[in-house]
């Protein structure tokens, strides 16, 4: 039960896209990606921490590489004033499957992602499938499993409906689908659903 608002700001550098994710209770996440879908900056509302991409990643995420070859790996650090550095290592691959959701054509991807502390201790890992829009140059959430040292949960954030400017419900802060269900995972685990943008 959430709604994602995707938008651009005139004052941002070329290629920057922004996203705000809202639940029934309010904002969950706010983030920026660049034209290659690198995580430029993320704000996690439930925990109150911000992350920014460190410069010169060992293996930058590249949507262009994924589209050209069907596979892309990544290995980068983020820096946070609240929680320090975090290393993210993973990969995306095209499954070859194309889906149409609410008249929007998307390519399905498969992903795996692990987050590590600066000392190399695993913090959490996630795997599952997502979607990409070639036209919009962005990832859209899908189904996955997140595992931490103490917990594990499945998530399903697949898109249900796309609402464009001029259509009823555009810019509404209220989610429309899947609401009212009991959320069993802890609040901090819910945020992992928003990390892989």
Language model: regions and residue ranges:
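Extended beta-strand-rich segments in extracellular/periplasmic secretory proteins, especially
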Residues: 62-119
């Amino acid at each position: 039960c959430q709604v994602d608002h995707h938008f651009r700001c005139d004052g941002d550098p070329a290629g920057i896209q922004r996203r705000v994710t809202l639940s029934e209770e309010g904002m969950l996440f706010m983030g920026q990606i660049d034209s290659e879908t690198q995580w430029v900056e993320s704000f996690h509302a439930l925990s109150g921490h911000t992350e920014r991409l460190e410069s010169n990643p060992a293996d930058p995420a590249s949507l262009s590489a994924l589209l050209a070859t069907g596979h892309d790996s990544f290995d980068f650090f983020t820096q946070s004033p609240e929680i320090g550095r975090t290393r993210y290592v993973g990969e995306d691959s095209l499954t070859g499957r194309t889906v149409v959701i609410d008249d929007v054509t998307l390519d399905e991807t498969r992903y795996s992602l692990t987050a590590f502390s600066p000392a190399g201790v695993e913090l959490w890992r996630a795997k599952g499938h997502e979607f990409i829009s070639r036209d919009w140059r962005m990832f859209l959430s899908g189904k996955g499993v997140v595992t931490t040292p103490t917990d594990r949960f499945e998530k399903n954030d697949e898109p249900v409906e796309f609402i464009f400017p001029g259509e009823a419900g555009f810019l509404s802060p209220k989610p429309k689908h899947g609401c009212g269900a009991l959320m069993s995972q802890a609040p901090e685990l819910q945020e992992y659903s928003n990390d892989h943008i």
